Amino acid sequence: MRKTMIIPTYWCRKTGDPWQEGDAVYDHPTPVDQEGTLERTLVSMKQFSEKDFKLVILICPTTPEVEAAAYEQVLRIVGRAQLNAETYLFTAGDLREITEILRKAGLNDRGVQLLSMFGYSNVRNVCLLAASILTADAALLIDDDEVFELPDFVPRSLEFLGRRVYGDIVHGVAGYYLNSKGQYYDDVRPEPWMTYWDRFGCKARAFDQIIGSGPRLKRTPFAFGGAMILHRELFECVPFDPLVTRGEDVDYLINSRIFGFSFFLDNTCLLYTSPSPRDRQKS
């Protein structure tokens, strides 16, 4: 099975430069004068027992004004990490070149509008595009603020992909995150309003039922965009909805089910996530 891991990394204006009208909005992009968490993610991949995969790092600037600076930062980070993996840097400029090639091949204006690196859903779709270009049978979607703890993460995440389980072919596998406390719950500070809108409590109960109990593999009503493993039959049929600005991961799972694909969560497929407040600034 040909495997491609895609990691989008988000970059914004320098520290102290405010967000401007028209800039993309992400949770915690890295200012281009800082280095963020990407290197930590890449270094944690050195322990992998499975090295037969391609790695694509998708460089996502919040504005064209920081494209060049973001590229230089990522290039330095990748050079220091010295990963033993076939690695590609995918930039907004690369996407523009691909768009022009497809336009000349007959892609209409509506199709061209879908080729964008602005917003989470569009970024996820470019991740799928990169996997398709590299003829991957499996796309592993990972975020740049995660740390791998499992040396066998790659083969573990692919163990059931494409196989029949409970009468259905596994086309999508969701992993999950552990927070700084080693828990799979949202790492949030209690606020008074949560008494009346207990969304984190509801999520915790759902996580206990799906993540915290057996069996290892089970059908899931939720997935996490930075821990999704997709079979080629799925990602070349179902895209992320470009009009969904947040929650694109769960929306993708729902759309996958609508189109007849099965999505499961593997409760042994875990990553640690912890964006560094020292290295990040809110967009």
Enumerate the predicted regions with their spans.
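A recurrent flexible, glycine/aromatic-enriched loop bordering the glycosyltransferase active site
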Residues: 209-227
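Conserved small/polar residues in nucleotide/adenosyl-binding loops
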Residues: 272-281
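Short beta-strand-to-loop acidic/aromatic patch adjacent to the donor-nucleotide binding site
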Residues: 136-147
